[in-house]
């Protein structure tokens, strides 16, 4: 069974490209252009992993990460970032992120992380 993934990014072009690439790898992909939209989706659906941009307007990745983990503690969240200091990446891991990956994301690495998230989630069930 394929991994079910939610991709959250305010850049629509990036979102579309990532969704196409993940679908081409056999994943079931949903997208959201904001953390607020993603939260509504997380409350309705169950995902193996959430891939989320760290820097977004309105609610940034840190606030979203805290909220998502409070709502769904078992949710595996992989953050994508560009130009974020290492201490911010460490903070994200401490807040419950599964991993922080530099943009542009290496698709093989991201696929491995998603498969690991799915395996972890299956263990928790």
Residue ranges and their predicted role:
Residues 40, 62-74:
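Short amphipathic alpha-helix used as the core "switch/output" element in two-component signaling
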Residues 56:
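Receiver (REC) domain active-site loop signature in two-component systems and cognate sites
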Residues 31-40, 61:
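Helix N-cap/capping motif at the beta->alpha junctions
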Residues 12-30:
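Two-component/phosphorelay signaling modules centered on CheY-like receiver
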Residues 63, 84-99:
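Alpha4 helix (beta4-alpha4-beta5 surface) of REC/receiver domains from two-component response regulators
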Residues 45-51:
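Active-site beta3 strand of CheY-like receiver
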Residues 87, 105-115:
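C-terminal output helix
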């Amino acid at each position: 069974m394929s991994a079910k993934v939610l991709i959250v990014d305010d850049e629509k072009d990036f979102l579309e490209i990532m969704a196409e690439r993940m679908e081409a790898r056999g994943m079931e992909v949903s997208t959201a252009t904001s953390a607020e939209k993603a939260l509504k989706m997380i409350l309705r659906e169950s995902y193996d992993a959430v891939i989320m941009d760290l820097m977004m307007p309105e609610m940034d990745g840190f606030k979203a990460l805290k909220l998502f983990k409070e709502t769904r503690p078992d949710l595996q969240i992989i953050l994508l970032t560009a130009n974020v200091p290492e201490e911010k990446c460490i903070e994200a891991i401490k807040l419950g992120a599964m991993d922080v990956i530099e943009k542009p994301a290496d698709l093989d690495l991201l696929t491995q992380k998603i498969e690991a998230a799915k395996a972890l989630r299956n263990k928790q069930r």
